[in-house]
Each structure stands twice: as C-alpha cells, then as structure tokens.
Amino acid sequence: MAREYKIEDYRNFGIMAHIDAGKTTMTERILFYTGKNHKIGETHDGASTMDWMEQEQERGITITSAATTTFWQGRDGKKRRFNIIDTPGHVDFTIEVERSLRVLDGAIALLDANAGVEPQTETVWRQAEKYHVPRMVFVNKMDKIGADFYRSVEMVGSRLGAVALPVQLPIGAENDFVGVVDLIEMKALTWDGTIGAPATVGEIPADMADKAEEYREKLIELAVEIDEAAMEAYLEGTMPTNDELRALIRKGTIEVKFHPILCGTAFKNRGVQPLLDAVVEFLPAPTDVPAIKGIDVKTETETTRESSDEAPLSMLAFKIMNDPFVGSLTFARIYSGKLTKGVSLENTVKGKRERIGRMLQMHSNSREDIDEAFAGDIVALAGLKETTTGDTLCDPLKPVILERMEFPDPVIEIAIEPKTKADQEKMGIALNRLAAEDPSFRVKSDEESGQTIIAGMGELHLDILVDRMKREFKVEANVGAPQVAYRESITRAAEIDYTHKKQSGGSGQFARVKIIFEPHDGDDFIFESKIVGGSVPKEYIPGVQKGIESVMGAGPLAGFPMLGVKATLIDGAYHDVDSSVLAFEIASRAAFREGAQKAGAQLLEPIMKVEVVTPEDYVGDVIGDLNSRRGQISGTEGRGIATVVNAMVPLANMFGYVNSLRSMSQGRAQYTMQFDHYEPVPTAVAQEIQKKFA
C-alpha cells in the first residue's frame, strides 16, 4: 500500500491551554467539522470523544493525550491529513504536555477571552519554547461575559514575551459576538451559530473599517520583515498580494518569529473553519521543521534523520497507555522511514529488539488496524515488551538514539498499602504498569517501614493514579497522608581525609581519599578529579565517584536525597595488593558521610508558585491565609472583575488548600500551583522534620 497523503500535506499539531479554556470542546468541534465525529460530545455532559478515560469524563478535565487522525480540505481544495494530540491543561499533568510537544510540529494555544493568559498557559508556552514549536493563538469563548480580544492580544506580548500577529478581529463581543474580520482577505465572516453552518462572507461593518485598516497595516509591516525582497518591495510602495502575505505569515510562524492570532467561540460554532484553514496555511508540515537530531550508535556522533520515507526508519515512543481492549499500547511518532507490520526493530536505549505485531491508527477511542505507516505518522503499537516513554525504535542496521525527553522529579509522596492479601500482588503489577505509562510517577519501597511509597507531581496526580488502580486493576488500597519530598544540601566547603583499612587474613582492603565537598548552584551532583602523579590510579577513580553517588540518596539529617553538591578528589593513597575499586568506593562513602556533617547540612523544601484568582471581596482573606501558610505574596493584579494573588508557598503548607479556599470564598475562587524551586527550611520547622524522620 503506497502512501495516501504526501508528507507535505501532513499537519501534526496539538491544542494547548489552561484548564477550562475550552480545549476539549474545541477538539470536538474540529473532529466534527473534519467529518470524523457525527455527534458532538459536550464536556459538561461527560460525553466528550477525546476524554476517554472514565475519570476524565467524570472530572471534566483531560488527563491523557489521545492522538487522533482526521482530514481537512483547505481553501485551495486540497485535502490535508491532521494528526491531533490532545493535551491536558491541569498543572499536575504538565508532563503529558511536555511529551506531546516533543512529538508535535506545531500547536494552537487556546486562550479564554475573559481570562487571557493564565498561569498554566505560561507554563505550557515555556515548554513549547523549549522545543521551538511554531504556535498560533486562538482567543476562545468570545461569547462569554467579560470577553476582551484586545486585552488577550496585549497579554500575549506582556505575559508570554511573544510577538502577537492578529490575522482576525472580532465582530462584537459577549452576547453580540457574531463573527470575525479576516484581515488578509479584508472580508467579514459571520455565522448564525447552528452546528456545521458555513460562514457568510460579507463586507466589513462600517464602524470597524478604520480599525481593520489599521490592524491590516500592522500585519503587513510585521510580515514583510521576514523576507528581504518583500521588505524592499514594501518600502518601494508595492503591497504583497493576499497569497504572498499568507506565505510570509507561514514563514514567520514556522521560524517562531511571531504567532498569528485568531478568535471565535468553539461552543457556539463560530470561527472553527477559519482556524482549520489557518492550520493548513500557517502551521508546518513535518518537512518544514528542522530534521530531528540524534546520536549515531555506531560512531557516537551527532546525526539527523530527515522526514522522508527513503531515510532509515526511526521513531520515538512518547506515550504508553493501557487500553481496555488491546492491552498495553505504545504511541510513537515516526520521524523517518517506513514501518511495516511484522518487522523487528532495535530499541537503542534499552539495547533490545522489539517485534511490531499489531499496528493501530487511533481515533480518540476507536481504532483501525493498519499494515504500514510512514514518516510523519503517529501510530499506536500493541504488545511491545521493553519500550518505555522516551525510547527510540529504529532500523537495526542504522541504529540511532533520538533526543531524549527530560522529566521532572516528583514533589509529593504518599504511603500506600493493599487492603487485603489478595490485593498485594495485584498492587505491585498495577503500580509497575502505571509507572511505565507515566515517567513523573515513581514507586519505591521504604526499607525501614516496608511500606510502598508512591510519588508524583501533585495531590490530583496521585489521586487519579490511585483511582485508576481501583478501576482498571481492581486493587483496593489504603492511602496515607501526603508527605513532602524534602531534599538536603550543604552550606559550606569541607575537606575530608579518610583512610579505609581492613586486615583479616588473606588480602586486605586499603584506600585513602582526600576530597573537598562544596555546595554549587545547580541541583545535580558534580564530581571532579584533580589527581596528578598517580596517588590514586585512574582505574580506581570511578569507584570514588560511585561510592559518593551511592550515599547521596540519603542525607545525614533525615535521610532525604542530597542536591547541589560538588565533590573534588584532590589526593589519596593506594596499596599495590590491598587496594581495589570496592575499597575506594567504601572510603569515599564514609568520607561523604563525614563531609556532609562538617559542611553544614541543611534541609530543603519544595516551594510552589501559587496563583489564586478570587473575587475582590475575598482578597484580604486569601492573602491572610497564604501568609499563615508561610507564603510570600509576590503581587496582586486585576483580571476582569476578579483579582489575581501571586505567591510562593512551601508545599508542606498547601495540603488540603483546595477545601480551605472553597469555604473561604464560597466556592468562587480558584487556584493553580506548580513546583518552582527548593529553599532552606526554617530552623524550628527543620527540627520537627528531623524528629519525625530520624
């Protein structure tokens, strides 16, 4: 079977937004207008197509990014293939967003016309910057009370530091919102609001003519800056044609120089079709973005893989899901080459072979078996044994490791135990499966108490995982109170000279190390050797590093992992017979334990960036409450009729905050929080923690 759509006609994109900006409704509309969905599912009915896990439908939030393939005929009459990845907008699931962005070529950022740029929008935007993803912005919910398109455009500049390029203006707002002015064609597009109705094209309302001219002029000025020839022509008085203008906007969007801004209301069916046209016209095909980089396994040098069916096969596994009908599904993006059912591929990260048995094309919760897939496709593979998120699968003859994804460490832990003996074994299987799906979820055993500890990115994250264990794996579990994932570090430099000697008949053990331990700004561990003259032979130096790393996981104060330590090996001694890598490992372990005490060990706690959006009446109570939680208020600002309070608060003091805020504001205030940084714990609090964990 040959390729049905040219790779130039693919658009791999995602929709990213703050929770409640209308992302799931927008995806539903896109699926409806592109003909994949016959009945629109509304999020508030719990019937949405993309949100296919039970909890998502209950909670009305999107948790897992389902990938969907659909098609759209552009303005030029040509059909394009869309692969849409739905991403969650809740802070506890930023990891999902991160991995979706990693495999997308472009994205639509949705804004709520009333709230503008919200905290999660900033987080997701920053993640997209990291991967240099071309983005458009759609100002949604223009029919909502307090909708303000121009304020949202201003916030894209002031809050996101991005260059906003409005290509449409709204006609009316709130209940009077009827359509948009297309600044490229200089026509008015209006909709009567019935599902699936095309736009009525007409003249721009007289009272908007001047504004439209002014914004079109700004649009052209920004667009011609992208291309020297267009700029020269413009300065000589030649205006670009509409098609030339679209080409310039496309070029600038793909180069991430600016972001086209459109508007509408997905719920009321106004503005969806022009957005789909804009995906075709402004967002990149896989061939428009730089070729993916990787490491050639044979030569260990950097290499690239072009988006072409002729290139050697390479693909990145970006998500693992348990499907109730198919079992474990691995979602992968094919970057180069052609994939055929039945072939064996190399997992270069694990050094294992995987056979491709069953291949599926996913529509949100229905699936279609396929035998072939090509560069640019996103496929679901059933039955892979060794592959986890972030692994590369490729042609065994041309092995490559594509750029890995980075996942943050969890900030919250809870103890969990099975309710019955029968649940014991099932719980182990369930937790391992969930951890394979979600790299930001960790499972470990507490050696002293024998308890199983699960760790994640927030209370909601762990709630949902425990809930899934119950539903999908039928495991009943008792859950402890949440614990903060504290860390330890050192505050000053300390030099330790330690000798490890053991003689008990036969060959003994001997190693002497002289190490300087000092704090550094990062969170990682840095090891350096300044040995000259062979006082410690080269082959023993890795043992010194390994020894220190093996005890970094349990600091001297309360047994928490250590952060931000630099160790420099400056001297030592060895014995021809009695020294070994193991002896140096033991010596450096003991040196570190002694050094951590002498270097002024301190406890660190995670500090969360908290944003509370509250009606004016409750601002005083909210600020007072955050102060009582050891919070530092960093400022307040107006947002529509509400006030936004920004603060930095220790995670330890934020447990159960959702209920306090609800009762304080009669359910009218909302908050978001995300991990920001680690900070030393105040002495009195640190003593309490040490007592508890010592």
UniProtKB/Swiss-Prot annotation:
CDD domains: EF-G, EFG_III, EFG_mtEFG1_IV, EFG_mtEFG_C, EFG_mtEFG_II. HAMAP family: EF_G_EF_2_B. InterPro entries: EFG_II, EFG_III, EFG_III/V, EFG_IV, EFG_V, EFG_V-like, EFTu-like_2, G_TR_CS. Residues 8-287 form the tr-type G domain. Catalyzes the GTP-dependent ribosomal translocation step during translation elongation. During this step, the ribosome changes from the pre-translocational (PRE) to the post-translocational (POST) state as the newly formed A-site-bound peptidyl-tRNA and P-site-bound deacylated tRNA move to the P and E sites, respectively. Catalyzes the coordinated movement of the two tRNA molecules, the mRNA and conformational changes in the ribosome. GO terms for biological process: ribosome disassembly. The gene is fusA. Keywords: Cytoplasm, Elongation factor, GTP-binding, Nucleotide-binding, Protein biosynthesis. PANTHER family: RIBOSOME-RELEASING FACTOR 2, MITOCHONDRIAL, TRANSLATION ELONGATION FACTOR G-RELATED. Pfam families: EFG_C (PF00679), EFG_III (PF14492), EFG_IV (PF03764), GTP_EFTU (PF00009), GTP_EFTU_D2 (PF03144). GTP binds at residues 17-24, 86-90, 140-143. This is Elongation factor G. One of its GO terms (molecular function) is GTPase activity. Transmembrane segments: none annotated. PROSITE patterns: G_TR_1, G_TR_2. NCBIfam families: EF-G, PRK12740.1-5, small_GTP. Belongs to the TRAFAC class translation factor GTPase superfamily. Classic translation factor GTPase family. EF-G/EF-2 subfamily.
